[in-house]
Regions:
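N-terminal carbohydrate-binding accessory modules
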Residues: 21-67, 80-81, 95, 99-101, ...
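Substrate-binding cleft and catalytic face of glycoside hydrolase catalytic domains
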Residues: 61-216, 224-227
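Noncatalytic carbohydrate-binding groove/subsite architecture in carbohydrate-active enzymes
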Residues: 166-283, 289-291
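Aromatic/acidic polysaccharide-binding cleft in carbohydrate-active enzymes
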Residues: 265-331, 344-353
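Carbohydrate-binding surface patches
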Residues: 348-388
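C-terminal beta-strand-rich structural cap/linker in extracellular carbohydrate-active enzymes
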Residues: 402-441
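Intrinsically disordered, low-complexity Pro/Gly/Ser/Thr-rich segments with frequent PxxP/GP/PP motifs
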Residues: 484-503, 577-608
C-alpha cells in the first residue's frame, strides 16, 4: 500500500502533459475564420491576476467580439535553468483561456534566463539553446496553437539587445522554423514581426530575404503605428510588402500583429473622436488590401497621465476602466465586418471620401463602409442601393432604416439613398453590386512590381472576384497606357521591361469596361485602374563609414539587382575639389545576379583628421556611384560663443550647407532656396555643443507647435552620435541623440528640445532673431544633457542637421504634413536610424 501511495505521489509531481484537444472545436473553428484580434490580456506580465485583471480584459474582448489574444510566451519562464523546463505557468494560462474560448497567438521570445545584459543570441550555443526551447514549447502546445510568432520587433532595442542585427535574426528564424516544424509539421511560423521605423522597415526585411528567409516563414507579420489618416500610406505600404515578397519568392499571407492609434488625454474631446475614426479606417483599409488578421494594440491604456508617452494612450479603454468612443466604434466594426468577405476598396479621392466593399454571404447582400478623408470634414453622398429598405449602421452602433415608400417598378433596379458621412465609417447595407463591385474587385495584378531592365514578369487584369460574386458580368480592357520602355502583353499576361529602360517609378494604367449580362439590366460601367512598377537600377552602391573599438571602418556594399554578372573594382573617392582623389581600391571579384557583395574595410583616421574644411566621400563601381557621405570639420575650442543671436563670432567656423533640391525630405513641388535653405555651424567645447544657423525663409520664425512637435514648424533638428558614425540601423539612446532647436513654439519662446527624452533642455541657452531674408538662431547645450561624453581634438562623431520650415498659409493634402524639411546628409529615417547620418571631425585650432 505504501508503495502504491509513493508512486501516486511521485506521479503527481511530474509536469502535466497537455491534453490533446479536437481540432474541430466549434469555437476554435470560428476564431480561425475571424480577422479581428487583440493585444489584450497581457497575461504573461500578470499571471497571478487571472481571476481579476486578466478576466476583466477577457470580458472586454468578448464584448468587442474578439477571440484572439496575442501573448508573450517567455523562454526564461519556461526554462528557468538551462536544460530544465517548467511549463506550469503557461499550462495554467492555456487551460484558463480555452475555457473562455480565447485563442492565444504566442510569441516565442526573448532571452534565456542565464544570459546577462542582453536578450539576443550571439554564440552558436545561444542559437542552439533557442532552438531547443522552440522545439519543446511547440511540441507541448501543438494541439492548442497553430500559429507561432518568432520574436517581437527584432529590428529595434530593447527587444534585441545589445544591438539589432538582421543577419543574427535570420539565423534565429531559420533555427526556430526548423525546430518548430520538427515538433509540429502543421504549425505556421510568423515573421519577421518588425517594428515600424517611420514606415515599415524595408531595409531590415530585404536583408532577411537576401539571406534566404522567404523559405522560413508561413505568414508575414509586421507592425505599424500612425496617428494620421491612412488612405494613402497604408495601401501603398502593403502593396510594397507584397511586391518585395514576390521579388524574392512568392506572396504569403500578411498579418499585422500590432497597430494602434494614440489618444492623448490632454485633449480628450478631439483625440478620442479621432482615435475612434482612425482605428476603424486603419483596419478596414488593411483588410481591403489583403491583410488576413489584424491585432489591435492596445486594449487598455497603460496609464492615463497626460505627461506619459504616446504609446501609453493606445487603448480602447482607459487605464481606469472607462471605455473610450473607440471601444464602441471597434465593436460596431467587428459586428459589421467579421465573417464577411472583404472585397476591396472603392475610392473617390477627388470627391473627398473613401469606402470598403463587403459581401455578406449569409444574407447575400453587399455593404459599403464609407467615410470622409482627413479629419473633421463632412459630406453628403448619394449611395446607389438595391430597391429595398436600406439599413445604415452609424459609427457607434446606432441603426437607421431608410424605408422604401412604394414597391419598385418592374424596371427599377436601384434606388438612391443620401447619407451624410464624416470621418467615421458608416455601414450602408444593400448597396447595388453592379455600381460598387467592379471597381472594388477588378484590379491590375500585381498592384506593385519590382523589375530589372530586360526582365519579364506575370501581369494581368484580375477579374475573378467579380466573376465569382457576380456571374452576370464581364470585364474587358478598352485602353491601356504602359509607359515607355514597358511592353504589356495582355493576351499572355506578361509585362516586359526593355534593357535600356531608366530606373524609377512607373505607372501602368488600364481603362476597364464592365458590362452586365442580365437581359433585363444592360448596364455598362467604365473606370480606370493602375499599378506601380519600380524599375530597379542595375546595381546599388552603399557607403557606410563607422566607428568600432576606436577604429574607423567602412562598410562597402554592392547590390546586383540585374540578371547579369558584375565584375570590377570598387573605388573610395574623396570629393573636395574639382579633381576627386581616389583614397583606396578594392577588387570585389564577381557579383552574381540578384546577389550582394559586402565587406568591412579598415581606414586610417588621418584621412579625415588632416583637413579643416568639409568634404565628402563616394564609392564608385563601374559607371555607378553611391550617395555622397558628407564629413564636417568642427572647431574644438576652450571658449564658448556668447548666445545672443549675433553670429559675428561664427564667421570663421565652417558651414554645413543645406540648399540643394536632393536634400529635401518633406515638401511639395516647386521648392526654391528662397522658400527655405541655410547654413548650420557647430562649435564644440569640453562641456558644450554650440550650434548656430543662418536660415533663408520667406515667412521666418513661424512655429506654434507644442515642444515635441516643433519639427512641424520653423526649427532646426540636430543629430549627434557621441560614439562616432554608426552602421547600426536603430538608435542607441545612450549615445545617439535628436535635438530640436526652435526660434518660437507654443510656449512663445525659443527652446531646445531633447526628443528621445521628450523634454525641454532648460539648461540650454538659446536666442533667435529675424533678418531681412529669414532668421538666425544660436544655442549652447551642456554635454551633461548627453551623459557627459568626453570630447577632444580628433574625436569623430555621427552628425546631421535638418532645417524645417512652415509658413502661415502652407497647406498639404490629408495625411501629409505641410511645409518643407531639408536634411544635410540623411533621410526621413534619421530620427530612428543613425546609419544615415554624416560625420563630424573635431579639430583643435592653432
Amino acid at each position: 500500500m505504501k508503495k502504491i501511495l509513493l508512486i501516486i505521489l511521485l506521479l503527481s509531481l511530474l509536469p502535466i502533459a497537455r491534453v490533446a484537444l479536437p481540432q474541430n472545436d466549434p469555437w476554435r473553428h470560428a476564431q480561425n475564420q475571424s480577422c479581428f484580434a487583440m493585444n489584450g490580456s497581457k497575461v504573461f506580465h500578470i499571471p497571478g491576476e487571472l481571476e481579476t485583471t486578466v478576466q476583466k480584459r477577457i470580458e472586454w474582448m468578448k464584448e468587442l467580439g474578439v477571440g484572439w489574444d496575442r501573448s508573450d510566451w517567455w523562454w526564461h519562464v519556461m526554462e528557468p535553468e538551462k536544460g530544465r523546463f517548467d511549463f506550469s505557468v503557461p499550462d495554467k494560462i492555456v487551460d484558463y483561456f480555452e475555457k473562455q474560448h480565447i485563442q492565444i497567438y504566442p510569441i516565442l521570445s526573448y532571452g534565456a534566463s542565464w544570459w546577462k545584459g542582453r536578450n539576443a543570441p550571439l554564440s552558436d550555443g545561444d542559437f542552439e539553446d533557442f532552438g531547443k526551447y522552440v522545439f519543446e514549447t511547440v511540441k507541448r502546445y501543438k494541439n492548442h496553437f497553430t500559429y507561432w510568432s518568432v520574436w517581437n520587433e527584432p529590428n529595434i532595442v530593447p527587444f534585441w539587445t545589445p544591438e539589432p542585427n538582421p543577419d543574427h535574426y535570420a539565423r534565429l528564424l531559420k533555427i526556430a522554423y526548423t525546430q518548430a516544424k520538427k515538433a509540429d509539421p502543421e504549425c505556421k511560423i510568423c515573421a519577421p514581426v518588425i517594428a515600424p521605423l517611420g514606415a515599415w522597415d524595408k531595409n531590415f526585411t530585404e536583408r532577411l530575404f537576401q539571406l534566404g528567409c522567404m523559405d522560413y516563414f508561413d505568414v508575414f507579420d509586421y507592425h505599424y503605428y500612425r496617428n494620421n489618416p491612412p488612405e494613402d500610406e497604408v495601401p501603398a505600404e502593403i502593396a510594397d510588402i507584397k511586391a518585395l515578397m514576390l521579388r524574392y519568392g512568392k506572396e504569403k499571407p500578411i498579418w499585422i500583429s500590432e497597430s494602434g492609434v494614440s489618444a492623448p488625454t490632454k485633449d480628450k474631446e478631439k483625440s478620442y473622436k479621432d482615435q475612434a475614426a482612425l482605428v476603424v479606417r486603419n483596419q478596414l483599409l488593411c483588410l481591403a488590401c489583403g491583410v488576413k488578421r489584424f491585432f489591435y494594440f492596445d486594449l487598455q491604456n497603460w496609464t492615463d497621465n497626460p505627461d506619459d508617452p504616446w504609446d501609453s494612450k493606445l487603448g480602447l479603454v482607459e487605464a481606469g476602466g472607462e471605455k473610450k468612443p473607440s471601444f464602441l466604434a471597434y465593436k460596431t466594426m467587428v459586428k459589421e465586418v467579421d465573417f464577411k468577405n472583404v472585397i476591396g476598396r472603392f475610392r473617390r479621392p477627388d470627391e473627398g471620401w473613401d469606402a470598403v466593399l463587403l459581401f455578406d454571404p449569409k444574407h447575400s447582400k453587399y455593404i459599403l463602409a464609407a467615410w470622409c478623408n482627413g479629419l473633421g470634414s463632412t459630406k453628403k453622398v448619394d449611395f446607389v442601393c438595391e430597391p429595398l429598405d436600406v439599413k445604415i449602421v452609424h459609427p457607434y452602433g446606432d441603426v437607421e432604416i431608410r424605408t422604401l415608400n412604394a414597391s419598385p417598378a418592374p424596371d427599377q433596379f436601384t434606388r438612391s439613398v443620401s447619407v451624410e458621412i464624416d470621418q467615421n465609417p458608416r455601414y450602408i447595407h444593400s448597396v447595388d453590386p453592379f455600381r460598387y463591385l467592379p471597381e472594388a474587385a477588378v484590379r491590375l495584378s500585381p498592384e506593385k512590381i519590382y523589375m530589372n531592365p530586360g526582365e519579364k514578369v506575370g501581369f494581368r487584369l484580375e477579374t475573378s472576384p467579380l466573376v465569382n460574386l457576380f456571374e452576370h458580368a464581364e470585364a474587358e480592357i478598352i485602353g491601356k497606357t504602359p509607359p515607355e520602355g514597358l511592353v504589356w502583353d495582355e493576351k499572355n499576361g506578361s509585362l516586359e521591361a526593355s534593357k535600356d529602360i531608366s530606373p524609377g517609378t512607373k505607372t501602368v494604367s488600364a481603362n476597364v469596361r464592365v458590362a452586365s449580362l442580365l437581359k433585363f439590366d444592360r448596364r455598362i460601367l467604365e473606370f480606370k485602374t493602375s499599378a506601380i512598377v519600380e524599375i530597379l537600377p542595375v546595381m546599388t552602391i552603399q557607403l557606410r563609414p563607422y566607428m568600432e573599438e576606436n577604429a574607423l571602418k567602412l562598410q562597402a556594399t554592392v547590390i546586383n539587382q540585374s540578371p547579369w554578372y558584375l565584375k570590377g573594382a570598387l573605388s573610395l573617392v574623396e570629393i573636395r575639389t574639382a579633381a576627386p582623389k581616389i583614397l583606396m581600391k578594392k577588387d570585389v571579384g564577381i557579383v552574381q545576379p540578384q546577389a550582394t557583395w559586402r565587406e568591412d574595410l579598415l581606414l586610417d583616421k588621418k584621412i579625415v583628421t588632416e583637413y579643416k574644411t568639409p568634404f565628402s566621400w563616394q564609392l564608385k563601381f563601374q559607371d555607378k556611384e553611391s550617395n555622397p557621405f558628407r564629413i564636417y570639420t568642427a572647431p574644438f575650442r576652450d571658449n564658448a560663443p556668447v548666445i545672443d543671436a549675433n553670429l559675428e563670432e561664427w564667421k570663421d567656423v565652417p558651414a554645413l550647407v543645406i540648399n540643394r533640391k536632393e536634400q529635401i525630405t518633406r515638401g511639395p513641388e516647386g521648392w526654391t532656396p528662397s522658400d527655405v535653405s541655410g547654413e548650420v555651424y557647430f562649435w564644440f567645447t569640453p562641456d558644450a555643443v554650440n550650434v548656430a544657423a543662418r536660415v533663408t525663409d520667406d515667412d521666418p520664425m513661424y512655429n506654434t507647435q507644442p515642444p515635441n512637435f516643433i519639427w512641424k514648424g520653423d526649427a532646426l533638428e540636430v543629430y549627434l552620435g557621441f560614439d562616432g558614425p554608426a552602421k547600426r540601423g536603430v538608435l542607441n539612446k545612450k549615445v545617439d541623440f535628436q535635438v530640436g532647436i526652435a526660434p518660437d513654439c507654443e510656449k512663445k519662446r525659443p527652446i531646445v528640445f531633447l526628443f528621445h527624452e521628450d523634454r525641454i533642455i532648460e539648461d540650454a541657452k538659446v536666442a533667435a532673431q529675424k533678418t531681412p531674408d529669414g532668421y538666425v538662431i544660436e544655442a549652447s547645450i551642456p554635454l551633461k544633457e548627453f551623459g557627459s561624453p568626453v570630447l577632444s581634438s580628433g574625436s569623430l562623431l555621427g552628425l546631421d542637421a535638418a532645417i524645417n520650415d512652415l509658413d502661415k498659409n502652407d497647406w498639404a493634402p490629408a495625411g501629409n504634413d505641410p511645409g518643407y524639411a531639408l536634411m544635410w546628409n540623411g533621410t526621413t529615417r534619421n530620427w530612428i536610424d543613425p546609419s544615415n547620418w554624416g560625420m563630424a571631425v573635431l579639430g583643435k585650432e592653432e
